[in-house]
UniProtKB/Swiss-Prot annotation:
Pfam families: ATP-synt (PF00231). It comes from Helicobacter pylori (strain HPAG1). One of its GO terms (biological process) is proton motive force-driven plasma membrane ATP synthesis. Produces ATP from ADP in the presence of a proton gradient across the membrane. The gamma chain is believed to be important in regulating ATPase activity and the flow of protons through the CF(0) complex. F-type ATPases have 2 components, CF(1) - the catalytic core - and CF(0) - the membrane proton channel. CF(1) has five subunits: alpha(3), beta(3), gamma(1), delta(1), epsilon(1). CF(0) has three main subunits: a, b and c. It is a peripheral membrane protein. Keywords: ATP synthesis, Cell inner membrane, Cell membrane, CF(1), Hydrogen ion transport, Ion transport, Membrane, Transport. This is ATP synthase gamma chain. PANTHER family: ATP SYNTHASE GAMMA CHAIN (PTHR11693), ATP SYNTHASE SUBUNIT GAMMA, MITOCHONDRIAL (PTHR11693:SF22). One of its GO terms (cellular component) is proton-transporting ATP synthase complex.
Length: 301
């Protein structure tokens, strides 16, 4: 009977866990819909920003301005890389499957790849899980911040990027990339690696559409071309991080929704298995009692 009581307790415990995971799945589904909408709107803004970049660069090319002095821009084919800053984004919480692990693996892979080429790598971390991992393993993270990946905020992203941009402009680093787990669809995510600094010259040659550029930019902005590009580039870099945070949050909710759905289904299966075990144990107990009663009756004859 003690065995039956143990099984009953296990069934009750698993059912309670099932209720929790199911509730977490519903919460993640609701949050995912909101995050997906924000990501969609933010992507539209990012594309508009890219279009403005293209217009300005095309206009400069049409005017015969090929030599861009802005430090934000480099000719990628001739760029010599000696130092790289990697900004990684992970979640502040767990229970989201391989979401954080996959990002960390990619960061380690990129770090090793650069080191094999004798390129110095510095890490900048956003998200408690990633920062904890590297701290536990004795890997230095230059700048770290928590509670930003779970609550993306443009002002905080802007502040975080300020130091990164300063290091780039002062020559402390030659390249800045962002690594995060991005939202692909409701049931899948993908690791994304994006170079945000420097911005390559090749953008000029990808958009030879002078008429469209002239139609889009109808007035002459004040300041030199490089000043205009610096202002746009600064906004582009800041928004690149902000969009990555939004994209990562949507992917996190997607991963957690899947993880909780899997956990709920596993709990259902375990309840079925335990119920079968309980019924078998109960049947065995009844059979044993009947055998003992019959044996007692026979002994009294």
């Amino acid at each position: 009977m003690a065995n039956l009581r143990d099984i009953r307790k296990k069934i009750g415990s698993v059912k309670n866990t099932q209720k929790i995971t199911h509730a977490m799945k519903l919460v993640s589904t609701s949050k995912l819909r909101k995050a997906e909408e924000v990501a969609r709107n933010s992507r539209a803004y990012a594309l508009k920003l890219d279009a403005v970049f293209d217009d300005v660069l095309s206009k400069m090319k049409n005017q015969g301005i090929e030599d861009i002095q802005s430090k934000y821009f480099r000719e990628l084919e001739r760029l010599e890389i000696k130092k790289v800053d990697i900004i990684f984004i992970t979640a502040d919480k767990g229970l989201c499957g391989g979401f954080n692990t996959n990002t960390i693996k990619k960061v380690l892979a990129c770090t090793n790849e650069y080191k094999e080429k004798d390129i110095k790598v510095r890490l900048c971390g956003i998200g408690k899980k990633g920062n904890e991992y590297f701290s536990f393993n004795g890997i230095e993270v230059l700048d770290k911040i928590n509670n930003l990946s779970s609550m993306p905020n443009y002002e905080r992203a802007q502040e975080f990027m300020k130091k990164v941009v300063e290091d780039y402009l002062s020559g402390k680093t030659d390249k800045v990339i962002i690594i995060h787990n991005g939202f692909k669809n409701m049931i899948s995510q993908e690791i994304r690696v994006k170079t945000i600094l420097p911005i390559g010259y090749k953008i000029i040659h990808q958009n030879p559409q002078p008429n469209e550029a002239q139609e889009t930019i109808t007035s002459e902005p004040s300041g030199s071309e490089d000043e205009i590009l610096d202002s746009l580039a600064e906004k582009y870099v800041e928004y690149s991080l902000y969009y990555a945070l939004i994209d990562s949050l949507a992917a996190e909710h997607s991963a957690r929704m899947q993880a909780m759905d899997t956990a709920t289904n596993n709990a259902k299966d375990l309840v079925k298995t335990l119920t079968i075990s309980y019924n078998k144990a109960r049947q065995e107990a009844i059979t044993t009692e009947l055998v003992e009663i019959n044996a007692g009756v026979e002994a009294l004859k």
